[in-house]
Structures are given as structure tokens and as C-alpha cells.
């Protein structure tokens, strides 16, 4: 059963705990405190994995924009490729001078060893950058 969200809207949920990035931006560059806050933000993306429904597939060229005045960030996502493997890209920027870039791709391959003969491997690359030059992947 599908849930009433698109893939792109679901990606915006990764910023549910963006206040961790706001706090990390205020921490000293290359400090353990910043690393800890960025790691906590990375783990927070798993808060939505309990769902059993799948999101609606976005159409090629479809975009989704979310501006959260309460949390102080702007998020923009687009489906940039549909076949042979779907790719979504997203960018967000926050008031505390951080940026968040995401690219996700669902790699599909035929594999006799997998149940059903299809092997699905999601590949997600996330980059977080701060205005002082610190960057995390």
C-alpha cells in the first residue's frame, strides 16, 4: 500500500532534526562536538524506516520545495533520472550557514542468487558543508 507522500517529500523528512546542524554550525570547526552533532544528524534519518508503505514514485522532472520558517531551512528536491535507474537530488540550506546535498539512486540488477531474481541496492550520498569549510559525507 502506498503512503500519501512522494519520494521527494519523504527525502525532506531527513531534515526533521535540522537543529542538530544548526548546533553543529555554532561548534568550533573540526571539533569533536561538531563531529558528534553531525553524526547524530546522520543517524536521525533512520527515524522513518519503520514504515511499511512505500511512497508514490515521482515523475521525471518533478520537484518539491519546502521552506520551514520555524526550523529555518529551505529544501528543494528533483527527480533527475527515471530510467534505467531512478535518481533524486536535493539541496537544503539552513539559517546557521550550513548546506545539505543529497543524491539517491536505486540500483537494480538481475541476479539469479536473489529471491525473485532481482537485486535492489539503494545508494544514497549525503554531504553536509559549513561556511567555515568543514565538510562531511
Predicted regions and their residues:
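Extended acidic, Ser/Thr- and Pro-enriched interaction/regulatory segments
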Residues: 1-137
